[in-house]
Amino acid sequence: MLSADAGGTNKPAGIFSGVTAKNISSYAELCNVEAAVDDSNVKGERKYLMSNKAKAILRCMPKSSLTTELVLDGNDIDGTPVIANSDVPTTQYAYGDFSNIVMGTWGNVDLIIDPYTLAAENSIRIVVNAFVDWKKVRKDENVIVYGKVSAPAASTPGK
C-alpha cells in the first residue's frame, strides 16, 4: 500500500502510484505544502509519512540560514508527527489527514503451512493470501499531498 507500484489484478496500487511528487529542499517549501493541505479544509490530524532517506535529509536540514534549529526534531516537524517507513519510495513523503483513506478486506485470510517445498533446506514455507484494497474518502487533490525531499544546496560563506 505504501509503494509507488501500479495496481493490477492481484494487488492494489500504492498510494504513491501515479502522483507527481513536488521536490522540496527548504523548510519554507515544506510550510507551503502544509498550507496547501490546510486550504483544503482538512479537519483531521495531519501527519507526515516518509521514507527513511527523506527523514534523514530533514534531520540535517536547517530551518533557515540564520538558525541551527533543524526541520525534523525527534519524530515531529513543528509538532506534526512523522512516520518513517522503508516501504515508502526513496526520498518521498506524503502529508495530510490519513483518516481520509479507507481500507477494505474481503473474505477470510488464507494461511497455508507448506512443510514440503523447502523440506530439503529443513525449512517450512508459509503462504498468506488476503483480498485488500484502499481508496481516498475525499477526492480533493490536497487532502494528502505528495513530494520528494532533496538536500538543500550548500551555502557559500559570505553570501
Regions found by a protein language model. Name each.
Residues 1-13, 38-49, 53, 82, ...:
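Long, contiguous amphipathic alpha-helices that act as assembly "spine/axial" helices in icosahedral shell
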